[in-house]
């Protein structure tokens, strides 16, 4: 190789001197290859080099960033103590990042067109008798949707930026940073997750295509990593808008939309923790960005000391001037004294408290369809800033840098900074209230009273979908249950069964095409308490659970305060095993046992304890209350079934509710086999928890329901009685949904202690209007308002106010 090189060198022609024209030509080619440093395409303007599938983004040679999405927490409704805890956790959050890590907090409110209401709410025309109700329901939801601000999707992100030698080093460091960040969000109660590359691109696409949110038919983000190689495109081609225009000094254009970026001048001595929330409540597309970079602690202390030294020098100069002028040297300019005291306080905080110093750049970007709308949006935000003694100032001649600095990439080209301590920085609280706006079979439950956003949730997605509804008479308790029942029938294929002690649900059930079963001594509709099916239990022997029900029933009719004795339980269980043998040998309806068979099996044992139970059963077999001593005559195949037990009277009401609950369990086990859920609504639920044995059986059913696709809901106007039951803990632990309306003073106190409700939250169930209260779902607590338009057919079906019910009946007649 060396010899070849030598021969080449020997034969090479001697270099000649380039002419001036040749040098100019080469210099022109080099300049053209290097470019002029300006972006010539939309893609060139987007300030990053590479986006990787794991979400790591390379901004330039050594700078990398990752983005984490986080959700809201109930800060505004929290108690002062909880707010203080969140504030302290925010301080720890920022203190956890050293000066080598850039932090960008992004709060976005962007309009997104959801398309037709029927697609959003799942209410579709079926061409049947329920279409008028569907149209009515869709109109009501449309009305509530327009009242709220659900067209605007609010999202929150934090983008972290570091420098590293290469990709491997960046990934290794981010692995630690991500874990720490997610843990800090968890401490604050905020759910968070790291965005992957596609999610980050979709986020950027949404910001760079602001007009697409108003066009449901187009503009959706479409991308796959496998498309890059065959197409020869880069990731920027999938997110780039049609055009950027930065020809004006105070505005810019993205495609057909107008935008403007402003910065916040923090001139107030103190900032209120509501300022961020109020920025996000203004109308229009808004993106609030905070670029935060920590200052080395030693450098921060030196900087403050230099400032104090400068202020002291100014103080001495003022004092000398005072002496020369012949007035008191202790009289100093007020600003000088104020700044001097503030600087010393900051120094003390840095040296003795857990305070650090940060540089903050605060940007606010607006987008609108016209310049006029843009100026209105900017002026609204400026008014918010002015309310808190700050100034929102437009970036002159820096709109492009402002836009690129607002993108959640971790890049800050705007060097307008304000130095703040940790406590001063954490006052910009990014939390307001949690939202519930779920997909799937989500149904309407009112508007969030804090944000005015619609509440859409799917109880079946919860770990335990069981629910409770609390409310005083006239608070809207029954109407809330009716509204939920209506939307279940209109938007799902699930079954619904109602236990109606006061005959309040019959008109609604009939209008929705359901079946009303009236249970009373004079009725010919019979339900056999001893009905069973082979799927009655998930255990091998379905009689184990059925025996529990029979024990509960016998204890209820015997009225023993101390409960059944051990021998009594034994003889009942023995009789149960015997009477079901013919049915399991030949499972035909005529072989199903009835209460008379149970009584005979008890008497056949010939012992006093069995005779005592049989004598208690005699009233329900041969006496005046023999209504339940029949085989079932009703066919419960309708999707919507209402058991009207008002006619049972006082003596039969509790047994009737227990028997209905067991009948529901039978239905649940049957429907699970075909993959269909069964919702069960029981009013006056506290009656089932008054007696020890019926309470134990109800709690057991409550636990079993969720495993079998059942969704029970207990409603009561007497939460005090409900909460005094020894089984209430089992009920509450298996109920992730609580709909709490107005409460009496005594009940409020008990509920607050039991459910951990703060005084601020309790105000929403104190003398509240009908349809207003608190909603508990999983770990979320939201105040809600459910004001239905009254001039609709659906409202007339839902209302239980006597005057409105009477008026509706007269109108129908």
Spans of features found by a protein language model:
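Extended, folded cores of ATP/NTP-driven motor/assembly subunits in large transport
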Residues: 1-431
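P-loop NTPase motor domains
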Residues: 73, 80-99, 106, 110, ...
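Hydrophobic anchor at the beta1->P-loop junction of P-loop NTPases
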Residues: 469
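Conserved lysine of the Walker
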Residues: 477
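Hydrophobic positions on the alpha1 helix immediately C-terminal to the Walker A/P-loop
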Residues: 480
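Post-Walker A helix-loop "phosphate-sensing" segment adjacent to the P-loop in P-loop NTPases
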Residues: 487-497
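Conserved AAA+ ATPase "SRH/arginine-finger" region at the nucleotide-binding site
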Residues: 518-522, 737-746
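Conserved P-loop NTPase
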Residues: 755-811
